[in-house]
Each structure stands twice: as structure tokens, then as C-alpha cells.
Amino acid sequence: MGQKVHPRGFRLGVSADWQTRWFNEKNYATWLKEDEEIRKVVKNAYSQAGISEVFIERPDNESVTITIKTARPGVIIGKKGAEIGKLREDLEKELNRRVIVNVEEIKTPETDAQLVAENIAGRIEKRASYKRAMKRALSDALRKGATGVKVMVSGRLAGAEIARREWYLRGRLPLQTVRAVVDYGTATAKTKYGTIGIKVWIYKGDAEV
């Protein structure tokens, strides 16, 4: 039986980049745990900011550089930089290191797989039709320039007694092509019938190798 590989891990170093950029044998476990904590703090503090990814770099033992990719940079930066300043201070106190926080705006959130998955999850939690939410995400992504989109939901859809899986695909999605830039995102919708998993693949063309 064929096994599925993670679309991002399959393309690392070719058409995808690492979210964590450092190497240290001595402090590996400690730093890895810190990275998870940093991502959790950032996403919990700015859950309404449309955060897609958090990149972490450690150029040396005394500093951490955090780059946040978001659809709403103003929410994170705050008035006159107040919010981002508070975030930096809180992280420096927690990590006991110098922290640099950068914010990158996502120009087209409709073609960001993680944001699309979270948007569908939000609609399902508000009791919108999962089919309508999926079809709207597909049309929005294609309208904004995506070459191909696949959306899959699984769970007790519409409160059904038996869990099932449904998916829609529009355009091309070459999952076995390493140079293909395929963005991948997941989210979970919590409903009164249980959780519904959402997976999104967005093909944006080929990278120059």
C-alpha cells in the first residue's frame, strides 16, 4: 500500500525552505523545545492575525531571530510598534536571550494553504456548509493565481453518524514533482459532533532549480 509523504519535507532544499534554521549538537533538545514554545506563544497571542508560518534562526548562542508571516501585520506590530515591542520583551524574558522579531506580510492570503485551511475550519465551526466553504476556497485561490488546489475534509461531516472523507480538486497538482512549489496546510474544526480535519494543497508553479 502506498504511503504519503509530507509535501514540504519532500521538497526541502529545492522548492521549500526550513522553518527552523540552526544546528547545535549540545543544545539541540533545549533549543527545539524553545522553538515549539515560541511558535505556541506567537500563535496564541495573535490568533486573529492570520499567521501562516513562524521562521526561527539562531545565528549564535545569545540571540534568536523570529520572522512571522502574517496576513495582518498591523495586528502584530500594533500602534507605533507597541505590540511587537511587548512580544520581543516577553520572549527575551522567557528565553534569556536577545530576540529580534521581523514581520512579513502575506500579500495574497487566498493562496496560502495554512490560512485557507484555518479559514475553512472557522467557517465550519460557525456552522456554515462545509461544501460551500471548500468550493469558495477553491475558487478564491484559483482567482488569485494558483495553478491547482486540493481541499480535503474528514470527520463527521454535517453531523453524520459515520465519519467520512470528501475532497475537491481544481487544476493541476503534481505531488511527485520535487521542483513543483506545493504549499500545504492543515487545520482542525471543533464542532458539537467532534473534530473535523482539513487539509489544503496549493500548487503555485515550478521553482527554478
UniProtKB/Swiss-Prot annotation:
**Keyword rRNA-binding applies:** yes
Question: Hey, which family's this protein in?
Answer: Belongs to the universal ribosomal protein uS3 family.
The answer to whether keyword Ribosomal protein applies is yes
SUPFAM superfamilies from the UniProt entry: Prokaryotic type KH domain (KH-domain type II) (SSF54814), Ribosomal protein S3 C-terminal domain (SSF54821)
- Tell me, in a sentence or two, what this protein's role is: Binds the lower part of the 30S subunit head. Binds mRNA in the 70S ribosome, positioning it for translation.
- Which residues form each disulfide bond in the chain? none
Quaternary organization: Part of the 30S ribosomal subunit. Forms a tight complex with proteins S10 and S14.
Q: Which UniProt keywords apply?
A: Ribonucleoprotein, Ribosomal protein, RNA-binding, rRNA-binding
Q: Which InterPro entries match?
A: KH_dom, KH_dom-like_a/b, KH_dom_type_2, KH_sf_prok-type, Ribosomal_S3_C_sf, Ribosomal_uS3_bac-typ, Ribosomal_uS3_C, Ribosomal_uS3_CS
Q: What is the recorded name of this protein?
A: Small ribosomal subunit protein uS3
